């Protein structure tokens, strides 16, 4: 019985355990199914999580970008607020005035000129008072204190400097006497830029009338035309056919300059001036330029210097004339004043008046407006004033010396008178040799005729061209002139030849050689080119004598003597072959040589 109860209890326990186990198995099966289901669904869940994570990251980036944009916008807004505040503050500030700095004081204050008043004001600590210069423009605040400094005034009135007033104890002056356009004299202050500067009487200065300060030297064309310029590099060797005249001018100019002690020992006064007269185009201006260059070289050699310097005032007559009364005389004074300044430094100065007859005509002749009644005396006084200077000489050039006032030509003024003649045949050869050189491209045919020698070819060309120009043949007949006494004379082209015409002939020939090379590829200058150039030059000049007054034309051309009343051209086959006409002169004026 006991054994049966025990078995029942064990069976019941086993049954219970079996039930529990089956329950656990069922639970585990459910868990296993759940796990299997989760394992099946986990990749999709992971993808969803990844997608959500990516979306969250993208949203975070957008939010970050928006945040940065908002921060930047906020900064810009703050900057704009600050700028607008500064702009409002600036616009609300009272206006600032400008003034002219005058003088500084030991207590740190300065004097300024503003609004027509002279004030003593303070200076901002940010500015160095020692750096302020007289005449400088300064900025004043509402309390009229200097807060900034600028440059100098750049606009104002132009006046002429008459004199720089010396300072105490011979120090450089800081004031000047100036003359306005209304001839009103005024004393002005010189700005720092002009104190001690190389300004001289006659210079144009820019002033500010209210503050009475002169700021700047203004170059004016009417004055700068007369400024000394260094001599061009022209030597006597560049001039052909004028050996005798060059020797004369050397004796007149170089000897007194180079041997001044001998002249003083012999009590010989050097000439003050030279007149070069003769027909146009014969080298008067060229000689004047060569004089200064040669003189400077000789002085440099004598002093043992390498660099030679001289100055050449090339004054063309018509440039001096001015419609305002007294201006021409002022220009003449300015010319000689500049010459004296440079001559005082020991530098030779040549004052060259070209076309002298256009300004310094005979007084009282009635030929012009009689402006020479005051111009000629001004020149005479200046020439006489050059007497004490050892380094200035006046050279005048004219092709109508008979119209120059006799007082200028008398001894003691233009002492030496040198006639620059038209070149003869030998002189023409010399001039041609300056332009036709053996280094030029010569045509092979011409070279072959002279054994291939360039020198011989050039010499033959020159001889042939000069023979063509100077032969008294029918083709070279130019004019038949009739004088007032009834005499007639035939003039040839050689009677009107000049250095300028020779140069023009050579230039024409060279141009023909170039054109022939471009068309036929045959290079080189030929004799025929020069002969054709002679013909063209003659043809071009055949109409020139047909002027209103044949006698005046003849005098300008260098033909002096009996008055000419009739001119007839003799050029055959030209456009002026029948151009003869009779023209009576209005009056018998001038001195006939």
Swiss-Prot record:
Residues 5-94 form a coiled coil. Pathway: Protein degradation; proteasomal Pup-dependent pathway. Residues 574-593 are annotated as: Disordered. GO terms for cellular component: proteasome complex. Residues 592-593 are annotated as: Docks into pockets in the proteasome alpha-ring. Keywords: ATP-binding, Chaperone, Coiled coil, Nucleotide-binding, Proteasome. GO terms for biological process: modification-dependent protein catabolic process; proteasomal protein catabolic process. Residues 584-593 have a biased composition (Polar residues). GO terms for molecular function: ATP binding; ATP hydrolysis activity. ATP binds at residues 281-286. Gene3D superfamilies: 1.10.8.60, 1.20.5.170, Nucleic acid-binding proteins, P-loop containing nucleotide triphosphate hydrolases. The keyword Repeat does not apply. InterPro entries: AAA+_ATPase (IPR003593), AAA_ATPase_domain (IPR050168), ATPase_AAA_core (IPR003959), ATPase_AAA_CS (IPR003960), NA-bd_OB-fold (IPR012340), P-loop_NTPase (IPR027417), Prot_ATP_ID_OB_2nd (IPR032501), Prot_ATP_ID_OB_N (IPR041626). PANTHER family: AAA-FAMILY ATPASE, PROTEASOME-ASSOCIATED ATPASE. Belongs to the AAA ATPase family. Homohexamer. Assembles into a hexameric ring structure that caps the 20S proteasome core. Strongly interacts with the prokaryotic ubiquitin-like protein Pup through a hydrophobic interface; the interacting region of ARC lies in its N-terminal coiled-coil domain. There is one Pup binding site per ARC hexamer ring. Upon ATP-binding, the C-terminus of ARC interacts with the alpha-rings of the proteasome core, possibly by binding to the intersubunit pockets. ATPase which is responsible for recognizing, binding, unfolding and translocation of pupylated proteins into the bacterial 20S proteasome core particle. May be essential for opening the gate of the 20S proteasome via an interaction with its C-terminus, thereby allowing substrate entry and access to the site of proteolysis. Thus, the C-termini of the proteasomal ATPase may function like a 'key in a lock' to induce gate opening and therefore regulate proteolysis. Consists of three main regions, an N-terminal coiled-coil domain that binds to protein Pup and functions as a docking station, an interdomain involved in ARC hexamerization, and a C-terminal ATPase domain of the AAA type. This is Proteasome-associated ATPase. It comes from Salinispora arenicola (strain CNS-205). The gene is arc.
């Amino acid at each position: 019985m006991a054994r049966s109860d025990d078995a029942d209890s064990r069976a019941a326990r086993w049954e219970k355990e079996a039930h529990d186990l089956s329950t656990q198995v069922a639970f585990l099966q459910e868990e296993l199914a759940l796990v299997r289901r989760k394992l099946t669904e986990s990749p999709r869940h992971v993808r969803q999580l990844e997608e959500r994570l990516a979306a969250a990251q993208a949203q975070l980036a957008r939010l970050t970008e928006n945040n940065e944009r908002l921060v930047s916008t906020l900064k810009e807004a703050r900057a704009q607020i600050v700028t607008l505040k500064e702009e409002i503050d600036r616009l609300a500030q009272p206006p600032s005035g400008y003034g002219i700095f005058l003088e500084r004081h030991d207590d740190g204050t300065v004097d300024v000129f503003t609004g027509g008043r002279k004030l003593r004001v303070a200076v901002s600590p940010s500015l160095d008072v020692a750096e302020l210069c007289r005449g400088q423009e300064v900025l004043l605040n509402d309390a009229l204190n200097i807060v900034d400094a600028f440059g100098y005034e750049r606009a104002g009135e132009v006046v002429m400097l008459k004199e720089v007033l010396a300072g105490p104890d011979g120090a450089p002056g800081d004031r000047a006497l100036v003359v306005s356009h209304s001839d009103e004299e005024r004393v002005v202050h010189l700005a720092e830029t002009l104190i001690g500067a190389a300004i001289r009487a006659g210079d144009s200065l820019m002033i500010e009338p209210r503050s009475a300060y002169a700021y700047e030297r203004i170059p004016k064309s009417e004055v700068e035309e007369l400024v000394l310029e260094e001599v061009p590099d022209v030597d006597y060797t560049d001039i052909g056919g004028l050996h005798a005249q060059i020797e004369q001018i050397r004796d007149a100019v170089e000897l007194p300059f180079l041997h001044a002690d001998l002249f003083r020992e012999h009590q010989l006064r050097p000439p003050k001036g030279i007149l070069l007269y003769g027909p146009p185009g014969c080298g008067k201006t060229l000689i004047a330029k060569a004089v200064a260059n040669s003189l400077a070289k000789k002085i440099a050699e004598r002093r043992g210097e390498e660099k030679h310097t001289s100055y050449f005032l090339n004054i063309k007559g018509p440039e001096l004339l001015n419609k305002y009364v007294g201006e021409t005389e002022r220009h003449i004074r300015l010319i000689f004043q500049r010459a004296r300044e440079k001559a005082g430094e020991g530098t030779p100065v040549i004052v060259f008046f070209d076309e002298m007859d256009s300004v310094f005509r005979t007084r009282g002749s009635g030929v012009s407006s009689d402006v020479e009644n005051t111009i000629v005396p001004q020149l005479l006084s200046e020439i006489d004033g050059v007497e004490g200077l050892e380094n200035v000489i006046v050279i005048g050039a004219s092709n109508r010396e008979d119209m120059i006032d006799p007082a200028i030509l008398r001894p003691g003024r233009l002492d030496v008178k040198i006639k620059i003649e038209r070149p003869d045949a030998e002189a023409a050869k010399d001039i041609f040799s300056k332009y036709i050189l053996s280094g030029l491209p010569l045509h092979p045919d011409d070279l072959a005729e002279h054994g291939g020698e360039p020198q011989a070819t050039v010499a033959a060309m020159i001889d042939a061209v000069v023979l063509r120009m100077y032969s008294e043949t029918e083709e070279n007949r130019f004019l038949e002139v009739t004088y007032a006494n009834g005499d007639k004379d035939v003039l040839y082209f050689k009677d009107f030849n000049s250095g300028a015409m020779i140069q023009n002939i050579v230039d024409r020939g060279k141009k023909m050689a170039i054109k022939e090379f471009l068309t036929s590829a045959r290079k080189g200058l030929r004799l025929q080119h020069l002969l054709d150039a002679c013909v063209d030059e003659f043809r071009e000049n055949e109409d020139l004598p047909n002027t209103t007054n044949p006698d005046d034309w003849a005098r300008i051309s260098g033909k002096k003597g009996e008055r000419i009343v009739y001119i007839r051209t003799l050029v055959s086959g030209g456009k002026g072959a029948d151009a003869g006409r009779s023209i009576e002169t209005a009056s018998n004026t001038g001195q006939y040589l």
